[in-house]
């Protein structure tokens, strides 16, 4: 996963530096003076003028910076910095850092909305799922010159999406009701979680009927309550259903070609 942090200066301990290419031009901005090479000249070697550079393409060049830990620069194309191109570029950065633990600096000078799109896509591209629950995921620190609000929003959104992906990828032989209840308690920071089970579900006939025959511990009813700080806020109720897949009557369910893979 990627942990976003703000830095207006190029960290001396950075092990990976990303420099943006926008519309074929290297845009190093104020950080250009930190490098002793002509980055545009280096780009011309990899990508001649008659060869268009696609968003998400990365060109890596070796460098020598005596006062810094980094020994290479990755120039990443943002295309024309359109939303879809920023997502491609961000995903490319995330994939390049996947499985690694690095201190990264991304030298971009974009609008807040553009930077947020780039960061969200980077963390989504970095996502890796594994059945090995005891295996600690790799973690890279990504520093970028932008507002704290942008960093906070990008971190929350991308982390939430990746957590949802973890839940989706977890197979149902692991993801039983008891497991889901534990995840609700683990993930719902700042939210009150109440889990009903056993005799507390006496009046929940439908829920007990569906989950009663499971060899795993019985069904769970999870109630999550968020109390906003602002008094008098409108009450919102979200109702969801999570079922470990029920194969009963699969021959009656249509369309069959879609139902079968769900097993």
Task: Kindly give the residue locations of the regions a language model identified.
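Short amphipathic alpha-helical segment within the helicase RecA-like ATPase core
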Residues: 1-242, 247, 255
